[in-house]
């Protein structure tokens, strides 16, 4: 087993894991499209997102300092959680009746990190394609690794397409004064995914190792049209219409996966 790196002072590395998760569906009528947006707003409102992120904090072994959440009109929600590596237990000096510290002796909180989530429901009014995007950022300073939250977050949402970015920034020093720009081995984000997740998705990597920058795109392999239908479309489509919708939904997924418009 590798011996632990002995650091001089605090681990100043910042590790950031960013997700873009997409859920795709087909809603045929304007009424169904509006119902889909309302469903998403209810299913992934600020309260539910707060519960999910609170579990993420537990998974990565951090402690919650503060939570800010907001539901938006007409749609969408956001949650931001400020976290810390250290347990949030007030010291006697923090709760006793005494003057606070002077400005010149206040220390910067270098171990503070954060988790944010934003939701973006969107509908194509003509084609009937509805997309729900979730943006999640898990940024940690110190020894906590946001990669521990990878599998949990993918399974918490109906993830048809996922783009994941992981980067390490800053440096920390060992006791001999040498800089270390990363404190763990990694050659692919895929190595942090469970076997069932790797089997379920087609994945592509774009990694810039010398910049400690890692990128993985994921597209769900198994396509069952019934999983993508919402409202009347679940029962009212003819065989020909189902074939057309299948082509339309798959085309939408490929455009999002490759991040470019593609010919129909």
UniProtKB/Swiss-Prot annotation:
It catalyses: S-adenosyl-L-methionine + H(+) = S-adenosyl 3-(methylsulfanyl)propylamine + CO2. It comes from the Bacteria. GO terms for molecular function: adenosylmethionine decarboxylase activity. Disulfide bonds: none annotated. Pathway: Amine and polyamine biosynthesis; S-adenosylmethioninamine biosynthesis; S-adenosylmethioninamine from S-adenosyl-L-methionine: step 1/1. Keywords: Autocatalytic cleavage, Decarboxylase, Lyase, Polyamine biosynthesis, Pyruvate, S-adenosyl-L-methionine, Schiff base, Spermidine biosynthesis, Zymogen. Is synthesized initially as an inactive proenzyme. Formation of the active enzyme involves a self-maturation process in which the active site pyruvoyl group is generated from an internal serine residue via an autocatalytic post-translational modification. Two non-identical subunits are generated from the proenzyme in this reaction, and the pyruvate is formed at the N-terminus of the alpha chain, which is derived from the carboxyl end of the proenzyme. The keyword S-adenosyl-L-methionine applies. The record marks 112-113 as: Cleavage (non-hydrolytic). Its cofactor is pyruvate. The keyword S-adenosyl-L-methionine applies. Binds 1 pyruvoyl group covalently per subunit. Its EC number is 4.1.1.50. The modification Pyruvic acid (Ser) is found at residue 113. GO terms for cellular component: cytosol. It is an enzyme of class 4 (lyase). Gene3D superfamilies: S-adenosylmethionine decarboxylase. Belongs to the prokaryotic AdoMetDC family. Type 2 subfamily. HAMAP family: AdoMetDC_2. This is S-adenosylmethionine decarboxylase proenzyme. The gene is speD.
């Amino acid at each position: 087993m590798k011996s632990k790196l002995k650091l001089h002072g605090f681990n100043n590395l910042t590790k950031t894991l960013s997700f873009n998760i997409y859920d795709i569906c087909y809603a045929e009528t304007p009424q169904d499209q509006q119902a889909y947006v309302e469903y998403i707003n209810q299913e992934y409102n600020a309260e539910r997102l707060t519960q999910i992120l609170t579990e993420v904090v537990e998974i990565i072994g951090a402690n919650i300092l503060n939570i800010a959440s907001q539901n938006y009109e007409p749609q969408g929600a956001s949650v931001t959680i400020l976290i810390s590596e250290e347990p949030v237990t007030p010291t006697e000096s923090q709760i006793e009746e005494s003057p606070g510290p002077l400005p010149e002796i206040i220390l910067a909180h270098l171990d503070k990190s954060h988790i944010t989530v934003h939701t973006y429901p969107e509908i194509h009014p003509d084609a009937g394609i509805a997309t729900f995007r979730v943006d999640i950022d898990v940024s940690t300073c110190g020894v906590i690794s946001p990669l521990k939250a990878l599998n949990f977050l993918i399974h918490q949402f109906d993830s048809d397409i996922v783009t994941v970015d992981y980067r390490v920034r800053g440096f920390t020093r060992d006791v001999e004064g040498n800089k270390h720009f990363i404190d763990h081995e990694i050659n692919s984000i895929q190595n942090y995914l469970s076997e069932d997740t790797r089997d379920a998705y087609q994945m592509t990597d774009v990694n810039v190792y010398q910049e400690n920058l890692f990128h993985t795109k994921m597209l769900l392999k198994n396509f069952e049209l019934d999983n993508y239908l919402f409202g009347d479309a679940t029962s009212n489509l003819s065989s020909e219409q189902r074939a057309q919708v299948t082509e339309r939904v798959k085309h939408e997924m490929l455009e999002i996966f490759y991040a470019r418009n593609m010919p129909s």
